[in-house]
C-alpha cells in the first residue's frame, strides 16, 4: 500500500530547503516593496523598489511618501536622506537594520540556520490564500527582534516579511513583481553624495 507524500508545508525541513534552493542559485533580484511600521500607536507606510545582487548588495529606492536611498555594496552601507541633505554611513558587518536579512537571500542561505525554531504559523492566515506562513527567532538580530515571519508562495518565493520587535512594534515588508536574475551593474550599489551633503559615520538611525 503506497503512502502519500506529506502535503506541502507539513514538512518544515522540506519547505525550508525548497526556499533555500530557490534563492541560493539566483544572481540578482528586483521587486517593488511596501514597508509598514506599526508602533507607539502610529502606522507609517512607505514604498519603492528593491534590487539585490550577490554577494550582499542591496539598493532600496524609497519614493513614497518621501524619497530616500539605502544602499549596500556588501562592505559599506549608505543611507541618504535628500530632504535633510544628510548621508549616514556604516560598515555592513556592523549593520543592525531591519532591511539587512534580505541581503543574505542570495548566497548560501540556510533558512533553518537563520531562524531558530522555524515552525509553521497556525494562529494567523497569510495575506494571500494558498501561501504558507513560517516563524522563527532571528540569529543575527536576536536582540532588537523577537521573531521573524515569512510568507511563502507555492513557487517558494518570499512575498512578505514581518519583524516583531522587542518593544512591541512591528515592521512588515510586502514584495510584488519579483524579477529574478536581472542584469544589474555593480555601480548601482555605490553612492557618491552630492556636494554640500553632511556625512555622519556610525549608526544609520531609523
Predicted feature residues:
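N-terminal leader/targeting segments and the immediate start of mature chains
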Residues: 5-44, 193-206
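Flexible, surface-exposed loop/linker segments and immediately adjacent secondary-structure boundaries
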Residues: 85-131
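Bacterial N-terminal signal peptides
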Residues: 1-2
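An acidic-aromatic
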Residues: 49-101, 171-172
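Gly/Pro-enriched, hydrophobic low-complexity segments
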Residues: 113-196, 200-204
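Short hydrophobic/aromatic-rich beta-strand segments that constitute the beta-sheet cores
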Residues: 33, 58-62, 77-80, 136, ...
Amino acid at each position: 500500500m503506497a503512502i502519500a507524500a506529506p502535503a506541502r508545508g507539513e514538512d518544515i525541513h522540506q519547505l525550508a530547503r525548497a526556499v533555500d534552493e530557490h534563492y541560493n542559485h539566483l544572481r540578482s533580484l528586483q521587486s517593488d516593496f511596501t514597508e509598514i511600521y506599526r508602533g507607539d500607536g502610529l502606522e507609517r507606510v512607505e514604498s519603492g523598489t528593491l534590487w539585490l545582487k550577490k554577494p550582499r548588495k542591496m539598493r532600496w529606492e524609497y519614493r513614497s511618501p518621501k524619497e530616500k536611498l539605502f544602499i549596500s555594496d556588501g562592505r559599506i552601507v549608505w543611507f541618504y536622506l535628500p530632504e535633510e541633505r544628510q548621508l549616514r554611513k556604516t560598515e555592513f558587518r556592523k549593520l543592525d537594520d531591519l532591511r539587512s536579512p534580505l541581503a543574505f537571500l542570495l548566497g548560501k542561505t540556510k533558512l533553518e540556520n537563520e531562524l531558530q525554531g522555524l515552525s509553521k504559523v497556525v494562529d494567523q492566515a497569510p495575506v494571500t490564500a494558498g501561501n504558507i506562513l513560517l516563524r522563527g527567532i532571528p540569529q543575527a538580530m536576536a536582540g532588537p527582534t523577537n521573531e521573524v515571519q515569512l510568507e511563502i508562495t507555492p513557487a517558494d518565493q518570499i512575498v512578505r516579511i514581518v519583524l516583531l520587535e522587542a518593544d512591541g512594534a512591528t515592521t512588515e515588508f510586502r514584495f510584488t513583481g519579483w524579477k529574478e536574475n536581472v542584469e544589474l551593474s555593480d555601480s548601482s550599489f555605490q553612492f557618491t553624495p552630492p556636494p554640500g551633503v553632511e556625512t555622519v559615520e556610525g549608526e544609520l538611525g531609523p
